[in-house]
């Protein structure tokens, strides 16, 4: 029998009676040196500082018939190496059982006196994670840290993305006599050093609640700069079929209303808002900050001149090109021939030019007209006031 045991912070006293009994009955005990050091003298089993599944399986094969215990820090079901051993044990027909332990998230929750059921759980320990995307999507995010990613490095990434005011809590050496809890903003914690055994909780209390496509027009900061209206934005996002990890371009971004919605629809991707007018660029910065669209990157300059160095897009919204539509399409399709494209137009001439440009490049052009009317009070009555009709032209491969 092989027993896989979560040892929490490494304290023998924190183990259940069943887990302690399994360790004491075992002939072989595997685990990291830190965990083996926590075993009491009455555990007389042969102790081996091994934790890689292949090494453990090889040793078990060399010692047939012996019961074994394998110790893991934290809980066996929470980003643990236990699953990496349990699968081959079952495949080999070796009997195995699991005793869970107390995870670091439970220890931090207890130390803070707060429940953790609403926290998003993310591991940055030995695996890639995007803290900016996670904190854009979730109000409270718990990070396991380790290796190259520390609480300070994660907070630095948040600060660099404009989320330096997010609240942070770092738990060090949880469940031990050296336990410490530190508080601060992401910007403050980014410049500090922490114990190797640390976890991070980030709380973004200013997370925008707007998520469905088509944010109200009045929610954006605007001036005289033209803005794509709510209903058109919602339709454009539907046409672009945005995926969470997409790389997106918004050419002729104006106030940034489309860019912001694209950014929040693709929190694990990047949005490049291309705009040449200084007043509009300032509005994009303000709306980016207001909506915490931290994955929105402003590209100041005229398209297509500034497009050459951008990464290949998965989808592109073209709201204005100042006569350079064909050159913009060439840049887009040169980087990704299968990019999803949506062009907005008011003038019939622009509509015709868009259809011709897409068709000439082997794309099928589909045109949707959006005519929006909104009510306006007139004394005791309400009248419908029409906005200018908008054309959305999408281009897809035949």
Residue ranges and their predicted role:
Residues 245-254:
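Conserved class I S-adenosyl-L-methionine
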């Amino acid at each position: 029998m092989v027993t896989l045991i979560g040892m929490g912070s490494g304290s023998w006293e924190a183990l259940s009676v069943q887990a302690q009994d399994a360790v004491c009955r075992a002939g072989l005990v595997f685990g990291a040196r830190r965990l083996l050091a926590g075993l009491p003298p009455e555990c007389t089993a042969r102790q081996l500082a091994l934790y890689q599944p292949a090494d453990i399986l090889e040793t078990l094969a060399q010692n047939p018939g012996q019961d074994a215990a394998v110790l893991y820090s934290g809980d066996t079901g929470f980003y643990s190496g236990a699953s990496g051993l349990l699968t081959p044990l079952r495949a080999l027909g070796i009997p195995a059982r699991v005793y869970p332990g107390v995870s670091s998230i439970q220890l931090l929750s207890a130390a803070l006196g707060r429940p953790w059921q609403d926290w998003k759980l993310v591991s940055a320990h030995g695996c890639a994670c995007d803290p900016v995307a996670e904190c854009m999507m979730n109000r409270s995010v718990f990070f396991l840290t380790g290796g190259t990613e520390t609480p300070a490095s994660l907070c630095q990434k948040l600060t660099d993305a404009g989320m330096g005011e997010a609240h942070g809590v770092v738990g060090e050496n949880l469940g031990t006599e050296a336990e410490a809890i530190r508080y601060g903003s992401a910007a403050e914690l980014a410049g500090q050093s922490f114990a190797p055994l640390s976890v991070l909780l980030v709380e973004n209390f200013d997370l925008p609640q707007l998520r469905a496509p088509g944010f109200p027009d009045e929610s954006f900061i605007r001036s005289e700069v033209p803005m794509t209206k709510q209903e058109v934005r919602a339709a454009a996002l539907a046409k672009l079929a945005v995926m969470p990890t997409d790389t997106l371009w918004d050419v002729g971004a104006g106030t940034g209303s489309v860019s912001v919605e694209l950014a929040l629809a693709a929190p694990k991707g990047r949005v490049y808002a291309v705009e040449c007018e200084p007043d509009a660029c300032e509005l994009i910065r303000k709306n980016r900050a207001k909506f915490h669209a931290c994955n929105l990157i402003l590209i100041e300059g005229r398209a297509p001149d500034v497009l050459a160095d951008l990464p290949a897009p998965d989808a592109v919204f073209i709201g204005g090109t100042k006569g350079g539509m064909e050159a913009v399409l060439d840049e887009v399709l040169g980087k990704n021939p299968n990019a999803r494209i949506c062009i907005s137009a008011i003038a019939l001439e622009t509509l015709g030019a868009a259809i011709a440009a897409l068709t000439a490049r082997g794309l099928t052009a589909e045109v949707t007209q959006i005519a929006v009317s909104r009510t306006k009070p007139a004394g005791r009555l309400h009248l419908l006031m029409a906005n200018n009709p908008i054309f959305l032209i999408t281009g897809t491969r035949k």
